[in-house]
Amino acid sequence: MSAKSDYIVLIDSGQACICNQYGSVRNRVGDHGATNANISSDREFFVVSYRDYVCIFRWDGSMHRRICPGFNVAGAYFSGNNRIVINKVGGGGGFFNHDGGLNTSF
């Protein structure tokens, strides 16, 4: 793979795909049923949301961590301080540490 800055993450037919800047799929990762994806600001990892959980992936396609927040997931993204915001369907959610532990609910 080239530099990780050359890649984006798209959802295609319910599966996260690592793509080049032109949208050509390089690798499909994770389970089917993905709803959205977001890249960390340092581009070290990307997070993929599913209905009941969130997965953090590396650019080689390997999974770094699975977080099961205990609620239906509306979406997830990286915030500062190496935390992940997981939004709950219907409102609320939580800030989760990179290791998967809950930091703060909202």
Residue ranges and their predicted role:
Residues S2-G23, R28-H32:
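N-terminal targeting and processing segments
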Residues K4, D12-G14, Q21, D42, ...:
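Short loop/turn segments that connect beta-strands within the blades of beta-propeller domains
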Residues M1-Y7, F96-D99, F106:
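Low-complexity/repetitive intrinsically disordered segments
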Residues M1-K4, D31-R43, P69-N81:
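Repeated scaffold domains used in trafficking and secretory/extracellular systems
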Residues S24-G30, S62-C68, L102-F106:
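A short beta-strand motif characteristic of beta-propeller blades
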Residues Y53, W59, M63-P69, V73-Y77:
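A structural signal for the main folded, soluble domain(s) of proteins
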